[in-house]
UniProtKB/Swiss-Prot annotation:
This is Ribonuclease P protein component. It is an enzyme of class 3 (hydrolase). It catalyses: Endonucleolytic cleavage of RNA, removing 5'-extranucleotides from tRNA precursor. Belongs to the RnpA family. PANTHER family: RIBONUCLEASE P PROTEIN COMPONENT. It comes from Beutenbergia cavernae (strain ATCC BAA-8 / DSM 12333 / CCUG 43141 / JCM 11478 / NBRC 16432 / NCIMB 13614 / HKI 0122). The keyword Transcription regulation does not apply. PROSITE patterns: RIBONUCLEASE_P. Consists of a catalytic RNA component (M1 or rnpB) and a protein subunit. It comes from the Bacteria. Its EC number is 3.1.26.5.
Length: 119
């Protein structure tokens, strides 16, 4: 489970990330990122709309994305806000595909404090 200190919950954090941040996307997802005070821990949020599928499918996608980010939140720079927005093709994606997409987006945004070796 993603630690409570690393979860984004407030709508103003989501709005700030979407408005002021940068983004990188793939066929399955878009990663939005913004920075805040360096003293704060990195925080992550997820957006999975009804366009992705029904409730069961959306929750499965969210679980997979949370699992991917749970292991990467320690690699993020302090003060980073990250929102992962799932697109409809993510409904049929495997965990490995989502992992590759998230890793590629985080790396291209330059958000990692340390690089995780590819599997």
């Amino acid at each position: 489970m993603l630690p409570a200190a690393n979860r984004m919950r407030r709508s103003d954090e989501f709005a700030r990330t979407f408005r002021r941040g940068t983004r990188r996307g793939t066929r399955r997802l878009v990663v939005h990122a913004a920075t805040t005070d360096a003293g704060e821990p990195p925080r992550v949020g997820f957006v999975v709309s009804k366009a992705v599928g029904g409730a069961v499918v959306r929750n499965r996608v969210k679980r997979r994305l949370r699992a991917v980010l749970m292991h990467r939140v320690t690699d993020l720079l302090p003060g980073t806000l990250v929102v992962v927005r799932a697109l409809p093709p993510s409904a049929n994606a495997t965990s490995a595909e989502l992992e590759r997409d998230v890793d590629g987006s985080l790396t291209s945004l330059g958000l990692r404090a340390k690089v995780v070796p590819a599997r």
